[in-house]
């Protein structure tokens, strides 16, 4: 009951509908947030950081739109800003694509070869029949290629903006190489025509071969950029997971604190969880047992007396069990005795050894050697009840119901199931014990009509025995002995004022002879020793 009360304590955390714990809800939120993570946008994506691969124009353009708003905030004239608005992102991807850079590298190699042939023809190191006509064609082809390079540089400045172009040093160097290659060729062509040795200055264009690096990077940087984006996504997911971990850690700390409080409460109640779990498992077996204050324990045979005997022990919790406040003590106190909350002091441990008397079959003999029934109760309502009886030998197994004789006022009975095997046969008894047995057996057979004389004694109604058939008037001596017997019984019960245990009608002549034989044993059977 204390365990149930401890678990009925107010829970600081509200219950979640549907039986779903807060931990499960947090995990679901983490999964949803992880799924809803959008591709990470590139922040401060400069021109020099763009890849040179042939990527999807729409995706790349969306990545570059965030930089345009910052570019629009630059101070200066409008011509210094990138043109075409948001469409500039498409041109940026085109100018930085791997295909365009591969084409430019091929054009550089071609113009270098053409200019070298033209120079060899002009210095007459290469002679053939139509060499001058061929040199003129080479000159114009080289001029067109250099013009294409210059147009590409102007397009870069217009699309990227003058500031981004100037900030990128490698692009400034590339533009300078193009201008230095195109300007001498144009000047020599205007001054001397296509046949001029000054066209060799245009060979400086071969410095633009560095574009090969851009082609190589076009196949490496996309993979690198993709991995960086994946890393950024994992970093963002890691931040979310760290936040959820902090929340779960806080929940675990709160639950740990609550567990410590519950354990402290259980420690104050002196409860043992392991014992309570075992008691809960054994509860069905305990509940199936009969509710009785007494249990019958079959004792072994004595060396002196080789007779089977049944010992009735009162179920009292031991001192250690009473100190230990667990579920087993609760169950045993509930079914086997009064609880400590009732205010009634527990009686002392009582051991009763007696012979079982079958009230339904009075003809069956049951041997009883001697009987001492002391009972002393103090003035404060507590006392030690001690009952001692001699061991009895049972000639056969108990019947379906058997009653034990004792001084307990609750008049409890112990039952044993009939056994199919016959009990051990008793040994011959001494003559004195046989006489005592016969005397007590006659007395008990006369009392067999009332299964619980002590309870009848506590009844306020007057007790009377029906007179047996054919009985005659009894003598005054027998009535005097019976009154002495009842008076001694009343002296034994100093606390409870009870009526005589045995009340005989004046017409009982049969018991006169029985009490005469019992006179010598009256002191032993019915005397209450001072305890």
From Swiss-Prot:
Locations listed in the record: Cell membrane; Cell projection, Dendrite; Perikaryon
Q: Which residues form a coiled coil?
A: 231-251
Extracellular compartment ranges equal: 124-129, 191-199
Q: Which InterPro entries match?
A: TMEM266, Volt_channel_dom_sf
* Assigned GO CC terms: dendrite; perikaryon; plasma membrane
Q: What does this protein do?
A: Voltage-sensor protein present on the post-synaptic side of glutamatergic mossy fibers and granule cells in the cerebellum. Despite the presence of a voltage-sensor segment, does not form a functional ion channel and its precise role remains unclear. Undergoes both rapid and slow structural rearrangements in response to changes in voltage. Contains a zinc-binding site that can regulate the slow conformational transition.
Domain text from the record? The transmembrane segment S4 functions as a voltage-sensor and is characterized by a series of positively charged amino acids at every third position. Transplantation of the transmembrane segment S4 into HVCN1, generates a functional voltage-activated proton channel. The coiled coil mediates homodimerization.
| Record note on quaternary structure | Homodimer; disulfide-linked.
Q: How is this protein named in the record?
A: Transmembrane protein 266
Encoded by which gene?
TMEM266
